[in-house]
Structure formats: structure tokens, C-alpha cells
Curated annotation (Swiss-Prot):
Pfam families: MMR_HSR1
Name of this chain's protein: Probable GTP-binding protein EngB
Organism from which the protein derives: Natronomonas pharaonis (strain ATCC 35678 / DSM 2160 / CIP 103997 / JCM 8858 / NBRC 14720 / NCIMB 2260 / Gabara)
Job of this protein: Necessary for normal cell division and for the maintenance of normal septation.
Keywords (A to Z) from UniProt: Cell cycle, Cell division, GTP-binding, Magnesium, Metal-binding, Nucleotide-binding, Septation
All residue ranges annotated as the EngB-type G domain in the record: 8-196
Highest taxon listed in the record's lineage: Archaea
Keyword hit for GTP-binding: yes
GO biological process: cell division
Database matches in NCBIfam families: PRK04213.1, small_GTP
């Protein structure tokens, strides 16, 4: 398992498939630009932690899982296993889990990997976070590339077991475009969960 986490009481994690824009989103949230980003999947292979010691708080960008060009399957599985173990180990300290997905591709990817013997990664991770009792926000990224926005978000809600229309789940589904700096729906959703856990003092980060 990853052993790089600073010893902080509270944490927010970003998780998702490779190449969905997690590191770009991390940069947008923190204003810090030292996070690796790249056009080929799998650039981030270990967690990036952004640490606010004075607030006893850390935001963690976990490595992407799923397809990574040129990366053997056993390595991909190992990374996914480490991500799962990290979340399990720190579940009690995680104030919110942000599952980042590619708004343009996510429904097609879910449908392509749905079958009697297969659960799509995004659906599995959403269920996993919920099962652990971690407040979950799905950051539906790259929405600037989506034309049929409401229809696409309704379809995603349905795939995640949420009854459309998607708007009734605005504390769980946040349409954003990290590259364009348009992340206010995510900030509002995260603030909702921070408020529920009496951590309004962390609003300044979102």
C-alpha cells in the first residue's frame, strides 16, 4: 500500500480512471501546479498529497486506475489494489471522496464494461466509497465537450443507481470543466459534505 500520507486528521481524496483530469482538477483546487499531467493515461502512479498542516488537513490525488497505455495488466491491478487499500485504511479520516469521471466518455465506458461477470470501474468505485460510508461526489469533468448535458448526466445518474433527474443529486453529481477552471458545482457539493461534518473552517479550500 502507499505509505506517503502525511499524518493529518482529515482528508479529501480524488479517485478515478486514468486520464480523466484528476491532476488538472487537483491543480485547480489547490492553486499548486507541481502535479503531473499528461495526455497519455497513467502519468500519476503514486499519490500526490497537498498538505495543510496548520489545518490538520490533506487533499490526496490517488493514482488513476483502469486502462494505461503500455502498462501491463498485473501492474494496473496492483495500482488499483493499492488505491482500494489506501481508501479502506483511511476511511475514518476521509471527509469526502471525489470520483472524477470523463463526462463525454463515462456512460459509453460503463456500458461497454457492464455484463454478468463485470462491474465497470467507475460504478464499482462509487459503490465502494458509499459502502465505506464516505460522502461521495462524482466530479463529471470535461463537460465543456458535452452537447446533450442534461441527458448525459441523467444517463450517468441511472448507471450509478440514482433515479433521474440528476439535478436532485447536486450534492453527489457535479458537472465541471477543470481545464477551464469551471469547478463551482464541485466546490458547492464538497462544502455541503464539510458542513454536515462540522468542518466549515475548510470552506476556504473549496
Amino acid at each position: 500500500m502507499f505509505e506517503t500520507r502525511p499524518n493529518r486528521a482529515d482528508e479529501i481524496v480524488l479517485v478515478g480512471r486514468s486520464n480523466v483530469g484528476k491532476s488538472t482538477l487537483m491543480r485547480e483546487i489547490t492553486g499548486h501546479d507541481s502535479f503531473a499531467t499528461g495526455g497519455s493515461p497513467g502519468v500519476t502512479t503514486k499519490p500526490n498529497h497537498y498538505d495543510w498542516a496548520g489545518d490538520d488537513f490533506v487533499i490526496t490525488d490517488l493514482p488513476g486506475f483502469g486502462f494505461m497505455s503500455g502498462v501491463p495488466e498485473d501492474v494496473r491491478e496492483s495500482i488499483k489494489r493499492d488505491v482500494v487499500q489506501y481508501i479502506e485504511a483511511h476511511a475514518d479520516n476521509i471527509l469526502a471522496g471525489i470520483l472524477v469521471v470523463d463526462g463525454k466518455a463515462v456512460v459509453d465506458i460503463i456500458d461497454r464494461h457492464s455484463g454478468p461477470d463485470e462491474i465497470p470501474h467507475d460504478v464499482e468505485m462509487f459503490g465502494f466509497l458509499q459502502e465505506l460510508g464516505i460522502p461521495t461526489v462524482v466530479a463529471v469533468n470535461k463537460m465543456d465537450k458535452v452537447d446533450d448535458r442534461d441527458e448525459r448526466l441523467d444517463e450517468l445518474a441511472e448507471r450509478l443507481g440514482l433515479y433521474p433527474p440528476w439535478q436532485q443529486f447536486d450534492e453527489m453529481l457535479a458537472p465541471i470543466s477543470a481545464k477551464r477552471g469551471s469547478i463551482e458545482p464541485l466546490n458547492q457539493a464538497v462544502r455541503h459534505h464539510l458542513h454536515e461534518q462540522k468542518r466549515d473552517d475548510l470552506f476556504k479550500f473549496f
